[in-house]
Amino acid sequence: ALGNKKTDMNVRTCTESDVASIAVVFTESIHVLGASHYDASQRNAWAPRPADIEALSARLSGLQTLLAIEGDAVIGFISYELSGHIEFLYTAPGSERRGVASVLYREVEKALPGVSLFTEASLVAKPFFLRHGFSVVEEQNVSRGGVMFRRYAMRKAVVAQHGAQADRPALRAVRRLS
């Protein structure tokens, strides 16, 4: 169960045939969920309608992408690099605040044990990443299509390996050196 609503959600790896569904989640998430933080010109520069599926496909190539699936629908996705950079994390309108993003994020932590994670978070995503242990490294003002946006460079220190006290030997080593 996610949040207070029961759901049968599965996580799976993205395939080329999923790009159109991802484009819908990306675009609608920005236009619907981002409306409280970004004006129409910002949302249109960030995610034009109709979605540019070819451009998104190009951005996804070279990234690891996991999908949250409910029934036959993509309700969220996360894309990341093996370096620890989280490029995309979006949930579909109607699926927000149900734990979908947290489930996807935890899959990345499991996939990248011992890797520091970092991202450029929107105003909408910043609280999510703060709740998951990230800190703001820098506030950034960036331009997309001539339109200015505020975002946050954020980082989380090395993710502990799942299991009993995986980082203890490292702590002992640091104490001996100090």
Region locations from a protein language model:
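A short beta-loop-alpha structural element at the N-terminal edge
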Residues: 10-24
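Conserved GNAT-fold acetyl-CoA-binding loop/helix
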Residues: 23, 27-54
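A short helix-loop-beta-strand connector motif used in the catalytic cores of GNAT acetyltransferases and
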Residues: 50-67, 85
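A short, internal acetyl-CoA/4′-phosphopantetheine-binding micro-motif in the GNAT/acyltransferase core
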Residues: 86-96
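Conserved acetyl-CoA-binding loop-helix of GNAT-fold acetyltransferases
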Residues: 97-110, 131
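Conserved catalytic-core motifs of GNAT/GCN5-like acyltransferases
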Residues: 116-120, 135-153
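Terminal substrate-recognition subdomain of acyl/acetyltransferases
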Residues: 124, 147-178
